[in-house]
Amino acid sequence: MTFPNINPIIFSIGPLAISWYSLSYVIGILLGWFYANKIIEKFKPQITKKNLEDFITYAVIGIIVGGRLGFVLLYNPSRYFSNPIDILKTYEGGMSFHGGALGGIITAYLFCRKYKINFLSLTDIIAPVVPIGLFLGRIANFINGELYGRITNSSFGMIFPNSDLMPRHPSQLYEAFFEGLVLFSILAYTTFKHKTLKKCGLNSGIFFTFYGLFRITIEIFREPDIQIGFILDSLTMGQILSVPMLLLGGYLICQSNPK
């Protein structure tokens, strides 16, 4: 397969460069906001549209700060400790989903505590929305030619310009499909067909469970970060960080269905 050599920068105005990566965040937040509003209109949960509007600022800060710090601390600390100013260069890529998730969870908790809102009621609304951002983010990773997969002889192999010119799995597209489209479809089905918002924590549990499963599986095809490599000879950082999400998801599902 041929890599579509797309310029990561959409356009520049003087020193200001607009990248596909940055645009993916903006579009993801706007589409997510729209979709969450539709869910609120349909099911009239405890969370109101005004609550959601107020939460957007918290969410953006939590996701961006958490995602960036997660990448800096977990994936490439030596580079950023040597050149701290590079931490601000988010337009170059380098965001950790696990860090962004933790940042979003912390800001959601602080928001709920301030406005006296049930925490899981909020995360249950957000859970069906997150795959939209995941899909767009992975497509942006693909355009950037980053986070590519392991060497393969299969017909799916693709030569990325920033790699060693060996055919590799386009693992960004695998993640976009499973963590984005498939996970979105699962949560849309459970939310609208099975009315999972009626059981506090269930949507959140479904998200964490399936995201953990998909991420752990797809990491088998993804090249480990060069500065980290394999952990315990065969595991990647992404797999290790996804195990707690998988366990948390199972716990929330069980808690939402007490016997």
Curated annotation (Swiss-Prot):
Q: Where in the cell is it found?
A: Cell inner membrane
For this UniProt entry, which segments traverse the membrane? 9-29, 55-75, 92-112, 117-137, 172-192, 201-221, 228-248
UniProt cross-references to InterPro entries, sorted A to Z? Lgt (IPR001640)
| Biological process according to GO | lipoprotein biosynthetic process
Name the Pfam families on file: LGT
Binding positions for a 1,2-diacyl-sn-glycero-3-phospho-(1'-sn-glycerol) per the UniProt entry:
R138
Give the enzyme's main class according to its UniProt record, as a single word: transferase
Q: Name one GO molecular function term.
A: phosphatidylglycerol-prolipoprotein diacylglyceryl transferase activity
Per the record, membrane topology reads: Multi-pass membrane protein
Transmembrane listed as a keyword: yes
Coiled-coil spans in chain: none
Which GO cellular component terms are attached?
A: plasma membrane
Name the keywords, alphabetized.
Cell inner membrane, Cell membrane, Membrane, Transferase, Transmembrane, Transmembrane helix
E.C. number = 2.5.1.145
The main place the protein resides is membrane
Pathway participation:
Protein modification; lipoprotein biosynthesis (diacylglyceryl transfer)
Q: Which domain of life is it from?
A: Bacteria
Instruction: Provide the function of this protein.
Output: Catalyzes the transfer of the diacylglyceryl group from phosphatidylglycerol to the sulfhydryl group of the N-terminal cysteine of a prolipoprotein, the first step in the formation of mature lipoproteins.
Please name the PANTHER family in this protein's record: PHOSPHATIDYLGLYCEROL--PROLIPOPROTEIN DIACYLGLYCERYL TRANSFERASE, PROLIPOPROTEIN DIACYLGLYCERYL TRANSFERASE
Regarding protein family, the annotation reads:
Belongs to the Lgt family.
UniProt xrefs under NCBIfam families: lgt (TIGR00544)
| Name by which UniProt lists this protein | Phosphatidylglycerol--prolipoprotein diacylglyceryl transferase
This protein's gene is called lgt
